């Protein structure tokens, strides 16, 4: 069955107007998550804050997850929040800021023995150096990361 160009055009107009109407509504799922987070406590609140931050990639939302983890003295959540914030900076904001923050966060994450977050943060840090074409520094940092991993495996 062949559709007329007019029918296709009308379908496209309806689709675009539906999309625009949805966009005009803001982020209803995020708004409801914010309401639930405001009424929640503990890990449940933190998980909701993480979902909000992942959906918006707004640095203020990542700050909220980090501050919540700090308030709860939850070291793994602090490390995860720092990593996610750094990756958000790297992907959506400033690579310079991501590099600075990663450099500052690495000792804390290593001392906390959160190795998965540590090596993910280090990898993001090195990727930032590559993105800035700082190849020699990236190579040196990759060597340092490898040596750190070897020391952890031989202990």
Label the model's feature ranges:
Residues 1-4:
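Positively charged n-region of N-terminal signal peptides that target proteins for export
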Residues 7-17:
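Bacterial N-terminal signal peptides
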Residues 6-7, 49:
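Short amphipathic alpha-helical "recognition" segments used for binding
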Residues 22-155:
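A "functional boundary" signal
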């Amino acid at each position: 069955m062949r559709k007329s160009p007019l029918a296709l055009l009308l379908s496209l107009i309806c689709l675009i107007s539906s999309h625009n109407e949805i966009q005009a509504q803001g982020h209803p799922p995020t708004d409801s998550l914010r309401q639930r987070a405001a009424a929640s406590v503990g890990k449940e609140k933190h998980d909701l804050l993480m979902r909000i931050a992942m959906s918006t990639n707004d640095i203020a939302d990542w700050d909220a997850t980090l501050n919540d983890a700090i308030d709860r003295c939850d070291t793994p959540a602090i490390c995860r929040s720092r990593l996610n914030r750094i990756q958000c900076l790297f992907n959506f904001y400033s690579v310079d800021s991501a590099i600075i923050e990663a450099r500052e966060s690495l000792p804390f994450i290593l001392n906390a023995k959160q190795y998965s977050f540590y090596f993910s943060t280090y990898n993001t840090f090195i990727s930032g150096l590559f993105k800035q074409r700082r190849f020699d520094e990236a190579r040196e940092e990759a060597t340092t990361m490898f040596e750190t991993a070897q020391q952890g495996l031989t202990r």
